[in-house]
């Protein structure tokens, strides 16, 4: 973080020329008075706040997770659906794998069949690499460890604390650095 500043309209400066660097795997605490810019600083670091002056640089492949004080969750979804968002990449791969397998029941040329078999193999390798065959077990263990509400419960019916646990579960499954 090089020379980061943030001003809210009309002229409230909450961050002024901040320079920070972190060691790999360091645990960082941010303390300060109400309104001093703690949440804004964390949002800048997490990439949520994009309108700031200065430069934010991460090592290649480095990811940051942020659990907001009031997580924004889709009230029409179930606990399971929100938690699955944390593993969106592998969920998408598994979905495509199922679609490819369903296509085997359709009539096709030998060329199409060979392409389908090749794609199935690629997807299977990706699933193996991400340990995707164990996704259901992983989600259940994560939800259980955080004492999330039942997986079929609607988000709109959850308390604030339950919503935060669901959001935390989703965030941890994203495995940010």
Model-assigned labels for residue ranges:
Residues 1-177:
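ABC ATP-binding cassette signature C-motif
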